[in-house]
A protein has these predicted regions:
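Glycine-rich beta-strand-centered segment in the early N-terminal region that forms part
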Residues: 18-34, 45-89, 123, 128-131
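Short polar catalytic/cofactor-binding loops
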Residues: 8-11, 34-36
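NAD(P)H dinucleotide-binding glycine-rich loop of Rossmann-like/cofactor-binding domains
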Residues: 85-142
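Cytochrome P450 core scaffold surrounding the K-helix E-X-X-R motif
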Residues: 39-44
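Short structural boundary motif marking the start of a folded domain
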Residues: 1-4
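Short Gly/Pro-enriched turn/cap motifs at secondary-structure boundaries
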Residues: 7, 18-19, 50-57, 105-109, ...
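Short beta-strand or tight-loop elements
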Residues: 10-15, 59
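Residues that act as N-cap/strand-start positions at coil-to-secondary-structure junctions
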Residues: 13-14, 47, 111
């Protein structure tokens, strides 16, 4: 798959990366639309995103693969990335801001400035009927 990989100094390069493969409890989403979030703009403007990172967390797409044990989703489901309620055992689920994550811009996590995104089963949110994929990408779930 292709991805816009941050090179530092406010520069991106389009690179070929391996397609993600879902492990148990994971899904792969084919990205249809990705908004440019203010967080991403600031990460680039102030050069705080690590070299090698793939940004983009406000997006919509279609589930293209499901890992073993996934029950909530099937191939073809339309979703937005992030914002789903985490399981109570996850540290970020404990407290009133359950959607707040402490991961920053990890280089090992490929986000939606790529053609495909790997997600935990609990992360996506279904796109309601009548909402376009372009509109859904703008909802900012997280």
């Amino acid at each position: 798959m292709r991805a816009a990989v941050y090179q530092g100094n406010q520069q991106f390069a389009i690179k070929d990366l391996a397609d993600p493969a879902p492990a148990p409890g994971q899904v792969v989403v084919d990205v249809e639309f990705c908004a440019i979030c203010g967080t991403d703009v600031h990460a680039i403007m102030y050069d705080i995103a690590p070299v090698g990172s793939v940004l983009g967390h406000e997006y919509s797409g279609v589930i293209s693969r499901v890992g073993p044990g996934v029950e909530r989703w099937k191939v073809g489901d339309r979703v937005i990335g992030g914002g789903g309620e985490p399981p109570p055992t996850l540290a970020s689920a404990r407290g009133p801001r359950f959607n707040y994550r402490n991961e920053g811009f990890p280089t090992e996590r490929i986000r939606a400035y790529a053609e495909k995104v790997l997600m935990e089963e609990w992360e996506p949110i279904a796109i309601p009927e009548g909402v376009s994929s372009a509109e859904a990408a703008m909802c900012e779930p997280c």
